[in-house]
Amino acid sequence: MTEIPSSFVLPDPEWIYRVGIGQDSHRFLPDEDPKPCILGGIIFENTPGFEANSDGDVVFHAICNAFSSVTHKGILGGLADELLKTKGITDSVVYLQEAVASLKPTQRVSHLAITIEGKRPKLLPQLPSMRKRIAEVLHIPLDSINITATSGEGLTAMGQGYGVQCFCVLTIMEYCRY
């Protein structure tokens, strides 16, 4: 049997980690459409918005889906659709706030890793603003979030400029007495 080195620190046995994976994608509207392009809660000028019933923020939608994979509560396609039908709410910030509220009192967001693929808009200049906005909505430190962006070298519809897709991995810490 292999011995565990004394320098190896085991995690506190009262904390367990849950990992959620989220994805979303939307096609761009025609260039002349006035709907704004919103990603990570930030408006991108000179880029059309997305075909969606909501504001189409694929970053916030992917994060919502990651929360759903941890909490088992349908935010998109469930609660978001209900908010749209009954109150006309299309703001993905509200959907993400509901996702955060779906956590148990014993759960906390530990880390969020985001990857965005698309030919447009140019994301790099806005990544700090996006991280800040996401941190505000999730109530977590800025250094708990990272965003990478890729064009995908034009190999997918997203990389060819037809839309944007986002993947994310959400790590939740849960206090659990055994």
Swiss-Prot record:
**Residue numbers binding 4-CDP-2-C-methyl-D-erythritol 2-phosphate:** 24-26, 150-153
The cofactor binding remark recorded in the entry reads: Binds 1 divalent metal cation per subunit.
One example GO MF annotation: metal ion binding
Broad class of enzyme this protein falls into: lyase
Q: In the Enzyme Commission scheme, what number(s) does this protein have?
A: 4.6.1.12
The cross-references to InterPro entries, in alphabetical order and at most eight, read:
MECDP_synthase, MECDP_synthase_CS, MECDP_synthase_sf
Q: Give the metabolic or biological pathway.
A: Isoprenoid biosynthesis; isopentenyl diphosphate biosynthesis via DXP pathway; isopentenyl diphosphate from 1-deoxy-D-xylulose 5-phosphate: step 4/6
| Biological process according to GO | isopentenyl diphosphate biosynthetic process, methylerythritol 4-phosphate pathway; terpenoid biosynthetic process
Keywords per UniProt:
Isoprene biosynthesis, Lyase, Metal-binding
The record's annotation in Gene3D superfamilies points to: 2-C-methyl-D-erythritol 2,4-cyclodiphosphate synthase
Transition state stabilizer (site feature) positions: 53, 151
Q: Give the reactions, separated by semicolons, that this protein catalyses.
A: 4-CDP-2-C-methyl-D-erythritol 2-phosphate = 2-C-methyl-D-erythritol 2,4-cyclic diphosphate + CMP
State the PROSITE patterns in the record.
ISPF (PS01350)
The Swiss-Prot or TrEMBL record lists the needed cofactor(s) as: a divalent metal cation
Q: List ligand-binding residues for a divalent metal cation.
A: 24, 26, 61
What does the record give as the function of this protein? Answer: Involved in the biosynthesis of isopentenyl diphosphate (IPP) and dimethylallyl diphosphate (DMAPP), two major building blocks of isoprenoid compounds. Catalyzes the conversion of 4-diphosphocytidyl-2-C-methyl-D-erythritol 2-phosphate (CDP-ME2P) to 2-C-methyl-D-erythritol 2,4-cyclodiphosphate (ME-CPP) with a corresponding release of cytidine 5-monophosphate (CMP).
The family note in this entry says: Belongs to the IspF family.
Q: How does it assemble?
A: Homotrimer.
UniProt protein name: 2-C-methyl-D-erythritol 2,4-cyclodiphosphate synthase
- To which species is this protein native? Chlamydia trachomatis serovar D (strain ATCC VR-885 / DSM 19411 / UW-3/Cx)
